[in-house]
């Protein structure tokens, strides 16, 4: 294993040109979950092929590195690369804004063509995936003179629905993309390195990173960089599993053609991508939950993943008990956040409570729609609703302060309760 950490250098292959080259990017906290992706990749690999696997990370610890290296068979190479120095030395005023669920590592995939120019093709995979087939087949797909191969994002088929007008507007006006239905997911990207114009690519990175209203930062940037330069393939190669696509309403809303494509990819997907905050390690209701744990049991991180699962279930039960007990009180209540937690809670307990005035959500595409029998309102409607109590159902530790400030600014006098 050649340790590339903290060296601002171009990465060179360790095998010949026929090797399968794969990059993952994550922080140390995600190492245990990545081990499941790695195990699934190993179990479905070809013993006659070589696999050059490189981890992009800025904070991975020695303990995690040692545990991951224990998993590696003879035909695999596992190396670790910190791109921080390269980025700082190459770019000035580069805006790499992080969000609640996403660390700076989410951006590192963007720099693959720049630091891996000695490769012909490189596959990037997110770490919250399970490889469910031999990945060699993906490398055999021709680029057809395109710079990357990717899969259409799960939400793209429903973008034409009236409720998603704001999402379409973001893709067209903010990102400047001509065809929103070609918007791809960044969790699986096969780069055609030899075809990418590095100078032009570098300029576009600088320009696109300055957009201040990116919803999915790395993914939005990559869609700008590779507009009209991407070959879209079957979503079997990046099947997005989450509460949305498991919901029967999703299937009833999308068109017949898109529904057929979706159901076909759902049947024995080649790569399973757990794309929402609801993951197999924090919820038993996630689609392909059993597949994830089949591989997790084989990793040296199994006990740690199991502990995370147990703690998540305890935390979830505590939130449910707290929310349930608050709803029993004779007070006018508004729920803040049309979150997956709230949807699951209302369904699970079949909640029908006249004290619930409605749900507040900042996403304007949800305004006017219903969860169960409860209408979703915008924050501007809160004063008119005039609740005694506002319960935050979005599981974010820093969310209470912003809501409290909103209440002060709008002279709203209600008790604010957080479930975190």
Regions found by a protein language model. Give the residues of each.
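Active-site-proximal specificity loops/subdomain of glycosyltransferases
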Residues: 72-114
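Short, polar loop motifs at secondary-structure junctions
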Residues: 59-60, 85-86, 134, 360-366
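A glycosyltransferase accessory/donor-loop signature
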Residues: 1-20, 26, 186, 191-323
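Short internal beta-strands
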Residues: 52-59, 150-152, 357-362
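Conserved donor-nucleotide/metal-binding helix-loop-beta segment in metal-dependent transferases, i.e.
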Residues: 129-162
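Hydrophobic, well-ordered beta-alpha structural blocks that scaffold small-molecule cofactor pockets
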Residues: 306-420
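Short, acidic, metal-binding catalytic loop of nucleotide-sugar glycosyltransferases
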Residues: 40-49
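Short aromatic/hydrophobic "clamp" motif used to bind/position activated sugar donors
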Residues: 122
């Amino acid at each position: 294993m050649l340790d590339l950490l903290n060296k601002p250098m171009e990465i060179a292959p360790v095998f010949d040109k026929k090797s399968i080259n794969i990059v993952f990017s994550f922080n140390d906290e995600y190492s245990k979950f990545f081990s499941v992706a790695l195990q699934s990749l190993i179990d479905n690999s070809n013993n006659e092929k070589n696999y050059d696997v490189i981890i992009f990370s800025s904070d991975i610890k020695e303990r995690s590195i040692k545990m991951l290296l224990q998993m590696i068979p003879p035909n695999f190479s596992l190396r670790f690369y910190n791109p921080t120095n390269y980025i700082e030395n190459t770019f000035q005023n580069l805006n790499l804004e992080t969000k609640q669920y996403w660390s700076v590592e989410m951006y590192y995939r963007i720099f693959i063509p720049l630091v891996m120019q000695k490769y012909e093709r490189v596959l990037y995979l997110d770490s919250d995936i399970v490889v469910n087939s031999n990945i060699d087949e993906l490398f055999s797909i021709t680029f057809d003179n395109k710079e990357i191969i990717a899969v259409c994002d799960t939400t793209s088929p429903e973008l034409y629905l009236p409720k998603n007008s704001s999402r379409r507007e973001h893709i067209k006006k903010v990102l400047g993309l001509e065809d929103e239905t070609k918007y791809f997911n960044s969790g699986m990207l096969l780069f055609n390195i030899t075809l990418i114009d590095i100078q032009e690519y570098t300029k576009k990175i600088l320009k696109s990173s300055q957009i201040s209203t990116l919803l999915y930062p790395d993914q939005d940037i990559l869609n700008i960089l590779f507009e009209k330069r991407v070959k879209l393939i079957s979503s079997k190669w990046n099947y997005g599993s989450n509460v949305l696509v498991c919901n029967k309403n999703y299937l009833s809303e999308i068109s017949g053609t898109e529904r057929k494509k979706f159901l076909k990819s759902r049947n024995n997907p080649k790569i399973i991508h757990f794309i929402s905050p609801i993951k197999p390690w924090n919820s038993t209701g996630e689609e392909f939950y059993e597949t994830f744990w089949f591989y997790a049991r084989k990793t040296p991180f199994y006990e740690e993943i199991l502990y995370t699962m147990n703690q998540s279930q305890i935390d979830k039960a505590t939130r449910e008990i707290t929310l349930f007990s608050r709803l029993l009180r004779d007070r006018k209540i508004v729920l803040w956040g049309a979150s997956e937690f709230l949807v699951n809670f209302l369904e699970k307990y079949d909640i029908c409570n006249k004290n619930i005035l409605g749900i507040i959500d900042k996403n304007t595409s949800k305004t006017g729609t219903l969860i169960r029998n409860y209408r979703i309102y915008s924050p501007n409607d809160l004063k008119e609703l005039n609740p005694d109590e506002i319960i935050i159902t979005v599981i974010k530790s820093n969310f209470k302060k912003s809501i409290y400030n909103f209440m002060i600014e709008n002279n709203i006098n209600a008790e604010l309760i957080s479930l975190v």
